[in-house]
């Protein structure tokens, strides 16, 4: 996952920090600083 569109398609969301709680990073959104997270 390398942008916010594919992040959304994969049921993820973008955060500028570490992925919260039980979510896991599945890629990035707008560069390496913004992470795409998804709950499992």
Swiss-Prot record:
Phylogenetic placement of the source organism: Eukaryota, Metazoa, Chordata, Craniata, Vertebrata
SUPFAM superfamilies assigned: Defensin-like (SSF57392)
Organism: Bos taurus
Domain of life: Eukaryota
Keywords (A to Z) from UniProt: Antibiotic, Antimicrobial, Defensin, Disulfide bond, Secreted
Similarity field: Belongs to the beta-defensin family.
Name the record gives this protein: Beta-defensin 2
One Pfam short name: Defensin_beta
Cysteine disulfide partners in this protein: 7-36, 14-29, 19-37
GO cellular component term of the entry, any: extracellular space
This protein's encoding gene: DEFB2
Keyword Magnesium applies: no
Tissues in which the protein is found: Neutrophilic granules.
Function: Has bactericidal activity. Active against E.coli ML35 and S.aureus 502A.
